[in-house]
A protein has these predicted regions:
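Short hydrophobic/charged patches on amphipathic alpha-helices used for structural packing
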Residues: 77-80, 107, 269
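Gly/Ser/Thr-rich phosphate-binding loop
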Residues: 63, 85-93, 102-180
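Conserved pre-ATP/AMP-binding loop-to-beta segment of ANL
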Residues: 1-6, 12, 19, 35-41
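Adenylate-forming AMP-binding core of the ANL superfamily, especially NRPS adenylation
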Residues: 123, 160-219
């Protein structure tokens, strides 16, 4: 089994070659990680034209011998009735898909539900916590996969909410290399080779290129750590904790380039998303009124119409380094999403600094947020 995926949009469409080996790795990896068997029913509510639908939900069900239930679209109002009707034990997701389920009023069919696991990729840390709190004992199995680089990470235990976990057995070896986010290149040591990151240090994720791995749209980088190696660079920045678990910091194109240096957006979004009052959060850069650089801005939606307290907001963002905090957090009615429920930042970025509505501004002296401008 092999196929070609077209991702992106406009003039930036990318062709991704999914070989039989790549499909099998994802399919059998999912089946193993989720312990899928003939007693399971996988409910694929994700768009099947998305890699997660083809490789994870459908592939995992086939490899694990589980039943597969397909939906024409995701509808929170009928979701739990369908779960009961089909005996669903596994639910697939992409990005913020289950947000609408969490925001929906409690459903009688939700009580003592049969779902034991939500599997997918891209779930924000705040939403992850809401899912496990509301739908316990169901857990979240979060994957990260580069489409062609064979880098596959999985958070098997689910204990570290927001972590992408560790490399899936059988997938390519991965390393983090020091990366100059300003110059956009790897940092080399005195010997001319790339430098592997220390624990807690952010770097670019590399996947070792496999020999005879089929057609690749990305040319491997050769001679990075020694003269004979070959690696495929992702566009993703991670750090690794003391236990060996990987945490996504940002995608290189999404970095916010301020006068104080580059600022990753994911830590801002995670800090805001963990607030009970926040449903969705995005961080992005807009042109600075004072120069050619950017300033960090965040947009949030309320959870259940709750009011956001400036003190609580300040405490949440106080965990970030001072130069990485957004200068303004503004409340919006909703945040646009793609067909597979990924949050869109383009329109917000194009709009520039927010001109009205509820806003919280950073006091550069105190480090606190208040509603004054």
């Amino acid at each position: 089994l092999a196929f070609i995926l077209f991702t992106g949009g406009g003039d930036k469409i990318r062709i991704n070659h999914i070989t039989n080996r790549r499909w099998a790795l994802s399919a059998f990896g999912t089946a193993s990680a989720a312990a899928l068997s003939s007693s399971d029913t996988v409910y694929s509510v994700t768009p099947i034209h998305h890699p997660s639908g083809l490789l994870t939900s459908i592939g995992g069900a086939v490899a694990g011998g589980a039943r597969l239930a397909l939906a024409t679209r995701f509808d929170p109002t009928t979701f739990w009735d369908e779960v009961r009707r089909y005996g669903v034990t596994i639910v697939s997701y992409t990005w913020t898909l289950v947000r609408d389920l969490v925001e929906a009023p409690p459903d009688p069919a939700e009580r003592h539900h049969p779902v034991r696991m939500f599997i997918g990729s891209g779930m924000p840390a705040g939403l992850w916590k809401q899912v496990t709190d509301r739908f316990a004992p169901a857990t979240v199995l979060e994957f990260y996969a580069s489409t062609e680089g064979a880098a596959v990470l999985v958070n098997l235990s689910g204990r570290k909410v927001g972590s992408k976990g560790r490399p899936l057995p059988g997938s390519a070896e991965v390393r983090l290399a020091r990366y100059d986010t300003v110059a956009g290149r790897l940092i080399e040591g005195p010997d001319g080779f790339a430098i592997e990151c220390d624990v807690g240090e952010t770097g670019i994720l590399l996947a070792q290129a496999r020999r005879a791995s089929g057609i690749m749209a990305v040319t491997p980088l050769r001679g990075l750590f020694n003269r004979n190696d070959a690696w495929i660079a992702t566009d993703d920045l991670f750090h690794r904790d003391e236990d060996g678990d990987f945490w996504l910091d940002d995608h290189v194109p999404a970095l916010i380039r301020t006068a104080q240096g580059t600022v990753p957006s994911v830590p801002i979004e995670d800090a805001l998303g963990r607030l009970d009052e926040v449903s969705l959060a995005v961080a992005y850069g807009v042109a600075s009124p004072a120069g050619d650089d950017e300033v960090a801005v965040a947009a949030v939606t309320r959870s259940g119409g709750r009011e956001i307290d400036p003190v609580t907001l300040s405490e949440a963002l106080d965990r970030l380094p001072a130069h990485e905090r957004p200068v303004v957090v503004h409340v919006v009615e909703d945040i646009d999403r793609t067909a597979w429920f990924r949050l869109r930042k383009f329109a917000l970025r194009q709009a520039g600094l927010p001109g009205g509505g509820e806003q919280f501004h950073l006091d550069q002296n105190s480090g606190a947020y208040d509603t004054s401008s």
